[in-house]
From Swiss-Prot:
GO BP: any one term: translation
The family this protein is said to belong to: Belongs to the universal ribosomal protein uL4 family.
Coiled-coil intervals, chain numbering: none
UniProt GO cellular component terms: cytosolic large ribosomal subunit; extracellular matrix; lipid droplet
Gene Ontology MF annotations: RNA binding; structural constituent of ribosome
Keywords per UniProt: Acetylation, Ribonucleoprotein, Ribosomal protein
Name this protein carries in UniProt: Large ribosomal subunit protein uL4
UniProt gene name: rpl4
Organism of this sequence: Dictyostelium discoideum (Social amoeba)
Cell membrane keyword on record: no
Residue numbers bearing the N-acetylthreonine modification: 2
């Protein structure tokens, strides 16, 4: 999110010729999740319906042989004298059979997106285009650009009619490096699409946004990756191709000044979009650590309690098979068992050692406790 009050305006020679106020739409909250969701749904509206033929995979008079032949009950092609006879048919697991759940032309191809969601996604994409880090993260070559957003004087863009002059302008403002990236990125598509009239894939270049009727689209339409859009009809599919924020945008001065009337401000509704005002950020400063550690908040917060943690004595674990006290804690019946053993030994005339007698006394003392 940018906080600059003004943006410089450059001419065809890349010299500063003025400045223009930064529109509020470029300071709106950036919602990549919403942009991705809206782009995914809007992109589905350009699909063409397709489907499998109604009788594909079922144009044979196959019938099941039934049970008792030790073969599957799938329908089988009749006849003899050919490899095809006796083969399974119709099923999606069979060669030459129909697919499971054949595609139908009455599938729900289009998606409806709420108007406010679409507008929020557009303003988020515009705000992201004013953050150089997001523009560079998307892959655009803007190292030589003087300022982002880049605003060009009207007379330098609106009068363009030839592609040669447009290329010269892009070179003057150091934006042609992004076009070179597009030219170098052309490669053959992976997959079957290369045989379906979409053989090559290329990256996206800069987007030139103008206002009113101009001839600049004729001059720019033959430059790879460069697209032209009208500020009154901005499309999310162009502002965030692939649902990715940070498109490099070249504005004309008139289009840049028209953003406030097109999308409105934080205090004033839009003049073109009925009843629409820009979404406000929930917090003015997104640096939460800085806010929490500020003097104002720390003065109102109680000091944290210092808890002295005293060291605890280590727990002594005794083996109950060797330590009689530990065994008695686990099994009180061990007392009577030990007494019975001692009495049994004495009755048989076996001399009981003093150690066993001491143990017996210890057992009795523990039991009496």
């Amino acid at each position: 999110m940018t906080t600059r009050p003004f943006v410089q305006v450059f001419d065809a020679q890349n010299k500063v010729v003025g400045k223009v106020k930064l529109p509020n739409v470029l300071t709106t909250p950036i919602r990549p999740d919403l942009v991705n969701f809206v782009h995914t749904n809007l992109n589905k509206n350009a699909r063409q319906a397709y489907g499998a033929a109604p009788y594909a995979g079922e144009q044979t008079s196959a019938e099941s042989w039934g049970t008792g032949r030790a073969v599957a009950r799938i329908p089988r092609v009749p006849g003899s004298g050919t490899h095809r006879s006796g083969q399974g048919a119709f099923g999606n697991m069979c060669r030459g059979g129909r697919m499971y759940g054949p595609n139908k032309t009455w599938r729900r191809w289009n998606r409806k997106v709420n108007v406010n969601q679409k507008r929020y996604a557009v303003v988020s994409a515009l705000a992201a285009s004013a953050v150089p880090a997001l523009v560079m993260a998307r892959g655009h070559r803007i190292n030589g650009i003087n300022e982002v957003p880049l605003v060009i004087a009207n007379e330098s863009v609106d009068t363009l009619q030839k592609t040669k002059a447009a290329v010269e302008l892009l070179k003057k403002i150091n934006a042609y490096a992004d076009v070179t990236k597009v030219i170098d990125s052309k490669h053959i598509r992976a997959g079957a699409g290369k045989a379906r009239n979409r053989r090559y894939k290329v990256r996206k270049g800069p987007l030139v946004v103008v206002s009113g009727k101009t001839t600049v689209s004729q001059a720019l339409r033959n430059i790879p990756g460069v697209e032209v859009a009208n500020v009154s009809r901005l499309n999310l599919l162009k502002l965030a191709p692939g649902g990715h924020l940070g498109r490099f945008i070249i504005w004309t001065k008139s289009a840049f000044e028209q953003l406030d009337s097109t999308f409105g401000t934080f205090a004033k509704s839009s003049a073109q979009k009925k009843g629409y005002t820009l979404p406000r950020p929930m917090i003015a400063n997104a640096d939460i650590v800085r806010l929490v550690n500020s003097d104002e908040i720390q003065a109102a917060v109680r000091a944290s309690k210092v808890v002295v943690k005293r060291p605890t004595a280590p727990v002594r674990r005794s083996n109950p098979l060797k330590n009689l006290r530990a065994m008695i804690k686990l099994n009180p019946a061990a007392v009577s068992t030990r007494r019975t053993q001692v009495k049994s030994l004495k009755s048989k005339g076996i001399k009981v050692s003093k150690k066993n007698q001491l143990r017996a006394k210890l057992v009795a003392a523990t039991f009496n406790q």
